[in-house]
Amino acid sequence: MSSSALQVAKTATYLPDLVEVQRASFKWFLEKGLIEELQNFSPISDYTGKLELHFIGEEYRLKRPRHDVEEAKRRDATFASQMYVTCRLINKETGEIKEQEVFIGELPLMTERGTFIINGAERVIVNQIVRSPGVYFKDELDKNGRRTYNANVIPNRGAWLKFETDKNNLLYVRVDKTRKINAHVLMRAMGLSDNDVVDKLRHPEFYQNSIDSANDEGINSEDQALLELYKKLRPGEPPSVSGGQQLLNSRFFDPKRYDLGRVGRYKINKKLRLTVPDDVRTLTHEDVLSTIDYLINLELDIGGASLDDIDHLGNRRVRSVGELLQNQVRVGLNRLERIIKERMTVGETDSLTPAQLVNPKPLVAAIKEFFGSSQLSQFMDQTNPLAELTHKRRISALGPGGLTRERAGFAVRDIHPSHYGRLCPIETPEGPNAGLINSLATHARVNEYGFIETPFWEVKNGKVNKEGNPVYLSADLEDECRVAPGDVATDKDGNIIADLIPVRYRQDFEKVPPHQVDYVQLSPVQVISVATSLIPFLEHDDANRALMGSNMQRQAVPLLRPERPLVGTGLESQVARDSGMVPITKVNGTVSYVDANEIVVKDDHGNEHFHYLQKYQRSNQDTCLNQRPIVKIGDKVISGQVLADGSACEGGEIALGQNVLIAYMPWEGYNYEDAILVSERMVTDDLYTSVHIEKYEIEARQTKLGPEEITREIPNISEESLNNLDEMGIIRIGAFVESGDILVGKVTPKGESDQPPEEKLLRAIFGEKARDVRDNSLRVPKTEKGRVLDVRIYTREQGDELPPGANMVVRVYVAQRRKIQVGDKMAGRHGNKGIISRILPREDMPYLPDGTPVDIVLNPLGVPSRMNVGQVFELLMGWAAANLNCRVKVVPFDEMYGAEKSHQTVQAFLEEASKQPGKAWVYNPEDPGKLLLKDGRTGEPFDQPVAVGYSHFLKLVHLVDDKIHARSTGPYSLVTQQPLGGKAQQGGQRLGEMEVWALEAYGAAYTLQELLTVKSDDMQGRNEALNAIVKGKPIPRPGTPESFKVLMRELQSLGLDIGVYTDEGKEVDLMQDINPRRNTPSRPTYESLGTSEYEED
């Protein structure tokens, strides 16, 4: 193989642990965060001060969870541990101390994979990016075009304090966006004399106006200032000095009400160059005076003072699981505090114990609410391992305390220079969330303050020092350095070769000689996220298409026989490993036993380590999770080695699709507008066949008329339909079921009124009591079929927790194999997506000079305008690799090896491939990368040579089977009486405003009238129309739509006398066709039409 091939493989770097951000945060919560909250919360004293309850936070303990992870999933339980904490109740009068360990609630635990199991479902807590607490200076233009400056002091929790200037050079302050108050009034209220303030300022002359203004208003003393403050903050209440003092203290100086947090204190000290100790979390006089001083320096335009950019990553921080959970625990503890105080006051002082005071309910409720319904607690995307990994590394600006979609402007969503190496500039959703949801870059990590850091190698005198550990820098620190990108060319000793190097310095790009460079990036892929780093030749793709490529890889369905890409980037194995989908041995040793369900590794000391494999389990997205061993008995394994492949993995690497032979050429218009023409080989050889597992569930409930019963005895059902049911009436495992088949037989008792007339007649004649039950069985829905994989039965006797009112729950899992078909969506890794338009027999497909038919024909017009040329590089590199019988790893951004390196490498590979025996035809130097194909139908060659090669193509989760839908009659909405929408409701197709315009433009009046009445909400008309169709009569004239009547009624309810009149001025009664008993069924059926109507006139 040529030297370029070796270089291609050399640049692969190992990434840090990719789920670290989740695990480290939860570990911090257990070791520090929870203890911190319990300590802040204690002691609690009652209103008289006699009793004190202390929580000894560092002595909290967690009990072993009741169920392990797998058991919790099976039982629909939460994988959680009980929290106990030691409490001390001190009676101040008697000196008596009672100590007791008290249960304070259940805490869901994180699994090894960084997820939580809540009610049996795997969930992920997404990281949130919020504005960091601290002090921010910004400028605004007033209505006269004059620039004014303001300073905001933002705490972690508590009131915002804003200082601003006006055109008269007066300083004002606002508390929580209320009315503005003269800044000196606040200074006096805080007990500072004029001299105290003036001494601290570098330019007191600017501040003199504010002092004079306060004196003019007659506010000369602390008491008057407190009164004024109270008047402004609590208008309408009688002001008092003590009230003012209490208000000021509670707003800014009470640690329970005001908290800057560790980060806020760190940021304020850094910005204002203070040395206030780290544990002072409230505002100090020094903070306020320094803020005013800095603001005056900005006004006077004196060096050293700078404005803040709120979108800079130095001013935004990440809140991960631990911190979000800590905030929730604080909410729960505050609710608990009120309860404890009440109980202390009400209870008998002598007999009270800590356990009687502490009620775990508020804390449990707060934690449950967080995991169950917070915007940041999300149902994990388990479509494939990459989707799972990306979900755990997602960073959202939405959620409580963050932004809302509507309010977020362009600036927040935009890529900021400080994102470099921290947040991926490419991977973000399309649509309303663009830029608000980001992904962490590959090498980024979150530091103790919540700021994102990225690693660099140090550069000394033009030499890159790769010894030891890299240096991690946050965005603030990096701004002060000159940083070169990761693809800078160096010689073998690490000296930078070029004379001028492009560097980033203070968010600008400039070129400097090598000796001025401070740091070099670790790797070329450190700028982008994990999903984006799996795209080969990424640097040749337009960013919009790379974004689609990143997002679509997460939607690839795991296939039956996955195949790793011929052309990869070298990160595939790390993604598979860190996603948690592949079992990994933690010891060195030998494999002593292997079967489909478990692998046993014997370590060097003779101890056995068991690894149980997942077999055909259903994921959150109904795809199939299955693990297959890749080691044999007797194999030597080392710690960290992969033992088995998970779904969408092969050989320990992620394998989302198949390598297929692709030709870029038009074919009879079947690949017009991104459509895809595929060969029948894809279907027959199961290349794109995937397994999907559906879950069906039924409850037997206690009803007013008696219990529902799960049974085989179902009324009016043939014996044939019950063939596959066991004696309990539950389907047997392994049975093949189609739509409408019974999965679980269930009968419900029915009341007298439910009986049809013939049954009443029978009972009247014979006194015969037919079984008073109704068939309510669980059946396979329309369009579904498959094989029963598993049946689970839950009853109270077995100790299962059932929903209230249920006696028994049965769950049936049905697996189906879905082959690829017309209408399925496929995509490459470069954002080149399309829908299958036709499946052609392989003998009709265009074929290569050696007779091989191609697998897929794509439209060449999909490449130039979209500028994702990476797909062509991948195609040709794959073609060369397939002919050389090897796989290639190409790290993106390869210009460090020379200009146009991708081009040269691909060409060298193709030349190498054509030198193999019998492969001369593979590469034609006259027309590089193209071959003359022949038409499979005629055997004639096509006019022009065609680009052919191997590319990695994915089948996406948007399958036509899940989307195709039709309706004849079905359910109607109760109010508007229009058909419902959507496949799940068996709904109709919406005919919207624009479609009505189109029909109006054509003048298709009758079609339009029919669509708006009979086919929609003319209740009487549609029943008559159905009747007419059944009897073969002409369809009668449509009536009035129900929604028009609803509109009339709504206008009348506003008190408007509104009616409908004919041309002659006669009022039309819209309600005349309504039966007084209103017994028109919501779903017209043949029975409801009444037998009399069928008789011929």
Curated annotation (Swiss-Prot):
InterPro entries for the chain: DNA-dir_RNA_pol_bsu_ext_1_sf (IPR042107), DNA-dir_RNA_pol_bsu_external_1 (IPR019462), DNA-dir_RNA_pol_su2 (IPR015712), DNA-dir_RNAP_su2_dom (IPR007120), DNA-dir_RNAP_su2_hyb_sf (IPR037033), RNA_pol_bsu_bac (IPR010243), RNA_pol_bsu_CS (IPR007121), RNA_pol_bsu_protrusion (IPR007644)
Keyword Acetylation on entry: no
Name of the protein described by the UniProt record: DNA-directed RNA polymerase subunit beta
GO biological process: DNA-templated transcription
HAMAP family: RNApol_bact_RpoB
Organism in which the protein naturally occurs: Prochlorococcus marinus (strain AS9601)
Disordered: annotated segments: 1072-1097
Any GO MF annotation of the entry: DNA binding
Keywords: DNA-directed RNA polymerase, Nucleotidyltransferase, Transcription, Transferase
NCBIfam families named among the record's database cross-references: PRK00405.1, rpoB
Disulfide bonds: none
